[in-house]
Design a protein with these regions (language model features):
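P-loop NTP-binding module
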Residues: 1-187
Length: 187
């Protein structure tokens, strides 16, 4: 999930959009590793613990692109769920929306903790990331339930880690055996 959210943020920034990626997997922050950030104490948990903190001072520029910024998770708090349930998260996302074209939130996996469902209230769109040949089929039932019950806004699914060499269709370019039926390759 951090791979997908990071690449989405980078792609949008390369299109000239001002993007911030927010590390909201505050129990197991991963953005510091992805973006090689040195200051692991600065982050959104500081703001959520004390909304008087200047949120924009916690946002760090990226060395990848001038349009890409990172708001890491920060120090792991003793009460992550409580912090995410507070109105401070709503206020933080509003501030970020006023300052950036896109706010991408990297969250904890669903099912492990309730954090992601709490964060869902401030998202305009939710992306459930599955890994090919790894995600259990039962989780797809959970995705359907989340969509039907509208627990996450505009729920989409991304499947990554697809080994195209193992797939029967869609790997090779061309018309294959179907081309002959339409006259392709005839002179």
């Amino acid at each position: 999930k951090s791979f997908v959210s990071s690449n989405l943020a980078i792609s949008l920034s390369l299109l000239g959009k001002k993007v911030v990626i927010v590390g909201l997997d505050i129990r197991k922050p991963g953005l510091n590793k992805v973006f090689h950030l040195s200051n692991k104490e600065k982050g959104i948990t500081q703001y959520l613990s004390n909304p008087e903190t200047d949120l924009m001072e916690l946002v760090q520029p990226s060395d990848i692109n001038k349009n890409l910024f990172i708001l890491p998770g920060g120090a792991v708090p003793p009460n992550p769920t409580e912090l995410l349930a507070r109105n401070g998260l709503d206020k933080a996302i509003e501030i970020l929306k006023q300052n950036f074209d896109y706010v991408i939130m990297d969250t904890a996996p669903i099912g492990m903790v309730t954090d992601t469902l709490l964060i869902g209230r401030v998202a305009d769109l939710s992306v459930y990331v599955c890994r090919a040949d790894y995600t259990h089929k039962a989780e797809y039932t959970l995705i359907n339930e989340l969509a039907i019950e509208k627990k996450l806004s505009k729920l989409c699914t991304v499947i990554n880690g697809v080994d195209l060499k193992k797939r029967k269709y869609g790997y090779y370019y061309g018309y294959g055996k179907y081309g002959k039926y339409y006259g392709y390759g005839k002179r």
